[in-house]
From Swiss-Prot:
It comes from the Eukaryota. The keyword Zinc-finger does not apply. Residues 1-11 have a biased composition (Basic residues). Component of the large ribosomal subunit. One of its GO terms (molecular function) is RNA binding. This is Large ribosomal subunit protein eL8. Keywords: Cytoplasm, Ribonucleoprotein, Ribosomal protein. The keyword Signal does not apply. Belongs to the eukaryotic ribosomal protein eL8 family. Pfam families: Ribosomal_L7Ae. Residues 1-21 are annotated as: Disordered.
Length: 266
């Protein structure tokens, strides 16, 4: 083969004109000019973004958020931390189902009852005083006096009472007096039970004979979860959970310390 000449390979036949795709050119209207936006400072109006983080929330919302964060960050003593251990859903459902039977009467029901009694008296049938039906007793003062007099059969405390100091002493008092107690979610649910907005605590004092077995079963389960575990609960601190920034900073420092130690040891 002579010097300077390159070997030529076989040429591939060009594709037929039918197989070639004809690209249609996009018709651009010259009247429409491109005006790209500049989102720099002091330039175009910014696009809509999620600015939830920068919203100035109402004061009560800010306080709620600060409170919840502080509960996580600070070391929470066992007396307060025990209110995070609410009753399990299944037992709580059974408890509220039973408590629903012993709801106190509303103002309208009381009015109707007294009106019927007054009509009966006016008709000359005589006034026969009716026996007070067994109902759940509500309110921290009422519950406290019933526990102290050992008339309470079961005490139910809300987990989110604010200020918590209102019910802080109740678990210790119940244990001292040998009364079964439990902590449930939340004060609004207890409030609905007794026809109020919120309620700190309720207690059972009397029940009908047909419900005594159900109450005894509940009391047994609740005693196992709360009264019998008191020593364990009083040793368990809460909180002390750092945020992502603090955790990252601590991890960075630990890594630097480890590196320094490794270089020293060689």
């Amino acid at each position: 083969m002579p010097k300077g000449k390159k070997a030529k390979g076989k040429k591939v036949a060009p594709a037929p004109s039918v197989a070639k795709k004809h690209e249609v050119k996009k018709v651009v209207n010259p009247l429409f000019e491109k005006r790209p936006k500049n989102f720099g400072i002091g330039q175009d109006i910014q696009p809509k973004r999620d600015l939830t983080r920068f919203v100035k929330w109402p004061r009560y919302v800010r306080l709620q958020r600060h409170g919840s964060i502080l509960y996580k960050r600070l070391k929470v003593p066992p007396a307060i931390n025990q209110f995070n251990q609410a009753l399990d859903r299944q037992t709580a459902t059974q408890l509220f189902k039973l408590a629903h039977k012993y709801r106190p009467e509303t103002k309208q029901e009381k009015k109707r009852r007294l009106l019927a009694r007054a009509e009966q008296k006016a008709a000359g049938k005589g006034d026969v005083p009716t026996k007070r039906p067994p109902v759940v007793r509500a309110g921290v003062n009422t519950v406290t006096s019933l526990v102290e007099s050992k008339k309470a059969q079961l005490v139910v405390i809300a987990h989110d009472v604010d200020p918590i100091e209102l019910v802080l002493f109740l678990p210790a008092l119940c244990r001292k007096m040998g009364v079964p107690y439990c902590i449930v979610k939340g004060k609004a649910r207890l409030g609905r039970l007794v026809h109020r907005k919120t309620c700190t605590s309720v207690c059972f004092t009397q029940t009908n004979p047909e419900d005594r077995a159900a109450l005894a079963k509940l009391v047994e389960a609740i005693k196992t979860n709360y009264n019998d575990r008191y020593e364990e609960i009083r040793r368990h601190w809460g909180g002390n959970i750092m945020g992502p920034k603090s955790t990252a900073r601590i991890a960075k420092l630990e890594k630097a310390k480890g590196k320094e130690l490794a270089t020293k040891l060689g």
